[in-house]
């Protein structure tokens, strides 16, 4: 069935700004769940846990691009990040559908429409003031050198501003355990790629950067490329988010496949600290013994995108350096360096989000020379497969 995205969600909160939304892009929408398993509830009955909600959006005339896009949101967010923006504007799902891509949008396990049960572990929420400081009003707080360059968030970015309130109302609880979140996403994400059955483009944001590496590590043959928007980092430590030693596997908290193999990352991954950039150190692998490689990620084309004013600006270079050291071919686009100014961590929700999406699209398409006909044939084969499954059409 053809539907129009509900871009009027929260519209009552922003109508005082006289925002005039553009017409949305029509698409065919389906949803389904992947992963998970039955578990004993402790009373002799069973519950289903660790499943992941997936929303599948397809251009009404069918996709004309070879690879589907799988969009993975960050911490305290849901898949609504990719639909419409809190100011009422079109989101990235509409942008990519308009350009011929089919999109799969997930809610992380134990998040949003992916049910949480007590057995999944303790949950937490991000206070509005933290969102202001790190995402939406960074110029007010100046917690890192580039923070004052932030100009692209619509509105003031603080409590009481209707656009901020609309955005903050969309944030949700999340699992406190990063390992629990990563391992359940890894399993559910692998199940999603198995269901799609052909190589995809993973677009990850923030916390989901780790999820993308893990899913690709599990199903490298089903990942065409990865676009990591300000991925979780830097390796082995937290900088802005102060806390305990983190990402003991370098890019993740959960195990990755290294060569030579690693059992105990804290002792087997030998580290060094470098200070290649003023005011920003970086922990990477030591030069001796030779750095361990990430063989399942080496063949996957990867793009890391960093916004000019984000708290990732001082540290994303370190993530890229670690990846290169582990044998991954990675492109790093710093938006400020190509004339896209003023963006923060939530760059896909900001005023110039389409301009940034165009950068991603050009990168995707310059590497993809396969004819569109094959995409349509693959879509037809997938449709026949889905008709036999439990997918529910809205």
UniProtKB/Swiss-Prot annotation:
In Swiss-Prot or TrEMBL terms, this protein is called: Probable secreted lipase ARB_00047
Pfam families xref list: Abhydrolase_6 (PF12697)
Keywords on record: Glycoprotein, Hydrolase, Lipid degradation, Lipid metabolism, Secreted, Serine esterase, Signal
Name the glycosylated positions.
120
Q: Which GO terms describe its cellular component?
A: extracellular region
Q: Where in the cell is it found?
A: Secreted
Q: Which reaction does it catalyse?
A: a carboxylic ester + H2O = an alcohol + a carboxylate + H(+)
**Where is the sequence biased in composition, kind Low complexity?**
377-387
Any one GO molecular function term = carboxylesterase activity
Q: What is its main location?
A: secreted
Question: What is the purpose of this protein?
Answer: Lipase that displays broad substrate specificity.
What is one process in the GO biological process aspect for this record? lipid catabolic process
| Family named by the database record | Belongs to the AB hydrolase superfamily.
> Active site: which residues?
206 (nucleophile)
For this protein, the Enzyme Commission number is 3.1.1.1
Chain segments carrying region Disordered? 366-394
Query: Which interval of the chain is the signal sequence?
Result: 1-16
Q: PANTHER family this protein is in?
A: AB HYDROLASE-1 DOMAIN-CONTAINING PROTEIN (PTHR43194:SF4), HYDROLASE ALPHA/BETA FOLD FAMILY (PTHR43194)
Leading EC class? hydrolase
Q: What is the lineage of its organism?
A: Eukaryota, Fungi, Dikarya, Ascomycota, Pezizomycotina
Cysteines paired by S-S bonds: none
């Amino acid at each position: 069935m053809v539907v129009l995205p509900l871009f009027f969600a929260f519209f009552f909160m922003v109508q005082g700004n006289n925002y005039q939304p553009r017409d949305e892009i029509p698409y065919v929408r389906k949803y389904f769940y992947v992963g998970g398993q039955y578990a004993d509830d402790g009373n002799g009955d069973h519950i289903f846990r660790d499943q992941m909600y997936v929303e599948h959006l397809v251009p009404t005339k069918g996709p004309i691009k070879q690879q589907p896009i799988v969009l993975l949101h960050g911490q305290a967010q849901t898949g609504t990040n990719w639909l419409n923006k809190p100011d009422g504007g079109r989101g990235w799902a509409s942008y990519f559908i308009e350009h011929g891509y089919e999109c799969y949008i997930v809610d992380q396990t134990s998040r949003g429409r992916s049910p949480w049960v007590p057995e999944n572990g303790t949950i937490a929420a991000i206070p509005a003031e933290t969102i202001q400081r790190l995402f939406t009003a960074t110029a007010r707080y100046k917690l890192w050198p580039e923070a004052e360059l932030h100009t692209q968030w619509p509105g003031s970015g603080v409590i009481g501003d209707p656009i901020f309130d609309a955005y903050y109302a969309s944030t949700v609880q999340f699992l406190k355990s990063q390992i629990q979140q990563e391992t359940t996403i890894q399993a559910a994400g692998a199940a999603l790629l198995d269901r799609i059955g052909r190589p995809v483009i993973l677009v990850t944001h923030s916390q989901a950067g780790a999820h993308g590496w893990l899913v690709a590590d599990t199903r490298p043959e089903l990942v065409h490329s990865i676009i990591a928007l300000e991925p979780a980092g830097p390796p082995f430590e937290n900088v802005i988010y102060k806390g305990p030693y983190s990402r003991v596997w370098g890019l993740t908290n959960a195990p990755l496949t290294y060569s030579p193999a690693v059992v105990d990352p804290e002792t087997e991954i030998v580290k060094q600290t470098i200070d290649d950039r003023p005011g920003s150190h970086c922990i990477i692998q030591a030069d001796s013994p030779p750095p361990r490689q990430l063989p399942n990620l080496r063949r996957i084309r990867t793009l890391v995108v960093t916004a000019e004013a984000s708290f990732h600006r001082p540290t994303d270079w370190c993530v890229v350096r670690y990846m290169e050291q582990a044998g991954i071919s990675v492109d790093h686009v710093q938006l400020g360096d190509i004339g896209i100014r003023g963006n923060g961590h939530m760059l896909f929700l900001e005023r110039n989000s389409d301009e940034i999406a165009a950068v991603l699209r050009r990168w995707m398409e310059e590497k993809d020379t396969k004819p569109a006909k094959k995409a349509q044939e693959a879509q037809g084969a997938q449709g026949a497969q889905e008709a036999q499954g439990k997918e529910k059409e809205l």
